[in-house]
Amino acid sequence: MATINDNYLKLKAGYLFPEIARRVNAFAEANPDAKIIRLGIGDVTEPLPEACRTAMIQAVEEMGDRSSFKGYGPEQGYAWLREKIATQDFQARGADVDASEIFISDGSKCDTGNILDIFGDNNIIAVTDPVYPVYVDTNVMAGHTGVANDKGEFEGLVYLPVTAENNFTAEIPSQKVDLIYLCFPNNPTGATATKEHLQAWVDYAKAHNSIIFFDAAYESYITDPSLPHSIYEIEGAREVAIEFRSFSKNAGFTGTRCALTVVPKTLKAKAADGSDVELWKLWNRRQSTKFNGVSYIVQRGAEAVYSEAGQAQVKALVSFYLDNAKIIREKLTAAGLSVYGGVNAPYVWVKTPNGLSSWDFFDKLLQTVNVVGTPGSGFGAAGEGYFRISAFNSRENVEEAMQRITEKFKL
């Protein structure tokens, strides 16, 4: 009989967001007249920028003409898109990234999991706690962990607590770790990292021959000019870091699918024989074998982000969601809740009141005012007693949700 990958059996019964959906669906079936406002999963609500739509429509028309039809594209992505990304997203900020080091993909969620294909099974892996669940679950699936304890912490992972006491920025570990997951602006806490903080991580990685996986999916929400948008703005990062970015949260590509990963050609890791191997070559080989590239139509849409009109439209989208975050922050703070994040980030991290657990607060919020958020405990043990609220929704829904909470929800 065929056998399975038993590592999947170590995972919790359900990924966080499907469990939220299950509870919400059960409530909706029992209460068909309830108007549920979803501020949980970080999916965008506003339409694609006009510049992107126009470019994609034109690309569709090209596909209808033999002279301009496109078949299989380059697995790494079209050069015209990678050049614009390198120039406008990185080099314009002083980050030394070449277009040849950029790989276009269909999502940074996919890439943060798939990147493990090119690393060995014996690495010591560090994650923050709370953390985006994909970082943990993909390592469990790959067999890099033992079983989970009662708090949901997996044996074999190094957890770095982020709390109000350390301003939700993890401290440098005292032990040696090999692979480090960092996400700034942070999901779920909304925390940001200064250049000094990232420099400390880069220095640690250089001293210990570690690799940093830097998730910058929300960098477009940074408005503070002192904060870095890319880890490659930090001296020495090209020797120790891989960066992941996405068009999902700046240009609304959650349903369109386009992202990118940067693997510097100067980045190396050890082979079993002790030799140094360029990770760019391994990732290129992996992508060429397992990935056929993002569609031409979608890449033309992504390219339009870098046009003058596209830049203005994306900026307006980001500002819209940041204004939502500001409303959430101000209303919940006025209601007496302890609130973090929501500045330079689209997520607001809320301390649950009166000692309520994260899931109890979720259920109470859903049942009393029909508002959905994300239980902090779903992001890790240190997230217990917290709750994430997303700014990704319409202005009308955000304002109504906050009105319901402030007027009808008893803290």
UniProtKB/Swiss-Prot annotation:
Cofactors (names): pyridoxal 5'-phosphate
EC number, UniProt record: 2.6.1.83
Pathway(s) where this gene product acts: Amino-acid biosynthesis; L-lysine biosynthesis via DAP pathway; LL-2,6-diaminopimelate from (S)-tetrahydrodipicolinate (aminotransferase route): step 1/1
Any GO BP annotation: lysine biosynthetic process via diaminopimelate, diaminopimelate-aminotransferase pathway
Superkingdom: Bacteria
Record keywords, A-Z: Aminotransferase, Pyridoxal phosphate, Transferase
Name of the top EC class for this enzyme: transferase
Annotated residues for binding of pyridoxal 5'-phosphate: Y72, S108, K109, Y132, N187, Y218, S246, F247, S248, R257, N292
Record Pfam families: Aminotran_1_2
Catalytic activity: (2S,6S)-2,6-diaminopimelate + 2-oxoglutarate = (S)-2,3,4,5-tetrahydrodipicolinate + L-glutamate + H2O + H(+)
Subunit record text: Homodimer.
HAMAP family linked to this entry: DapL_aminotrans_1
Function per UniProt: Involved in the synthesis of meso-diaminopimelate (m-DAP or DL-DAP), required for both lysine and peptidoglycan biosynthesis. Catalyzes the direct conversion of tetrahydrodipicolinate to LL-diaminopimelate.
Name the UniProt record assigns to this protein: LL-diaminopimelate aminotransferase 1
Natural source organism: Trichormus variabilis (strain ATCC 29413 / PCC 7937)
